[in-house]
Amino acid sequence: MPASLLELKKKIASVKQTGKITEAMRMVSASKLNQTEDRDKGYTIYNNHVRKTISRLISSQVVDSLREQDVAIDKRNIAKIDYTDVFGLGITADMIQPRKNIKSTGFLVVSGDRGLVGSYNSNVIKNMMGIFEDERAQGHDVKVLAVGSVGAQFFKKNNVNVVYEKNGVSDVPTFDEVLPIVSTAIKMFLNGVFDQLYVCYTHHVNSLSSAFRVEKMLPIVDLDIGVKEAEAHRELEYDIEPDPNRVLMKLLPQYARSTIYGAILDAKTAEHASSMTAMQSATDNAKDLVSNLTTKLNRARQAQITTEITEIISGANALE
């Protein structure tokens, strides 16, 4: 058999084997995607209930404070409230009171620990480098808490201040596994390492699409503080022991932890979806390549057979 035919056969066998590997990797990613999606649903329900409870508790205290001051209870005055006047100095006010004179901003950035996930990691890095540049333009120091080795290594190579690094988060992370990460982030904020914290991650939309998100995590700003929430709290008619402030001192850190955990879980879901899509594309490409190589092989065989037949006929004619 000519060398060209042997070479084509080897290429076809090699590509088929690669296609089997990428298909297996696609199936693994699909399984992990289903697991993280299921876990994400349960987390979302829990976190929404905690947020509503906190919003109602804070709203009731804010409205009571405005009434004591004999101030109009409206959106404008609620927005101007100083939480230290309501809750005093402590964790509650620290976690919800916007800081003045921002000097340093923390970014908890979630990337992957490996490749073969399409444009997942490159999109995270590209977006973050632009954000860092904008933040520095405002005169703010940039401090990064990197979850995932791809982002961490890139940032350190490009002289970004990485103050915390966590690699090897499991493909379907549990709350207990992520707890040291989020506890460190909250502790750094409360200790003044940075004045505000943003969580930056890839949000999973569906199996084919995702969206990069930058969400302010600390101080907590996604609460619904208003008269409506205060009235909803009163309608429940339950007593709080020992008092609302002490309850909030427990609930607010817990809410921050669960919210950051949710972002990491969401990012893992998006990573698995990106990996699944990339492996599906690789498998499809392998099939197309096998088809093209098989066509070339068949044509080469046909040409070889035609040549051999021609030689036989020519030889027979020569003997006549």
UniProtKB/Swiss-Prot annotation:
Pfam families to which the protein is assigned, alphabetical: ATP-synt
Domain of life: Bacteria
Keyword set, alphabetical order: ATP synthesis, Cell membrane, CF(1), Hydrogen ion transport, Ion transport, Membrane, Transport
Any Gene Ontology CC annotation: plasma membrane
Localization per Swiss-Prot or TrEMBL: Cell membrane
InterPro entries given in the database record: ATP_synth_F1_ATPase_gsu, ATP_synth_F1_gsu, ATP_synth_F1_gsu_CS
Cross-referenced PROSITE patterns: ATPASE_GAMMA
Family, per entry: Belongs to the ATPase gamma chain family.
Task of the protein: Produces ATP from ADP in the presence of a proton gradient across the membrane. The gamma chain is believed to be important in regulating ATPase activity and the flow of protons through the CF(0) complex.
Protein name: ATP synthase gamma chain
Organism name: Lactobacillus helveticus (strain DPC 4571)
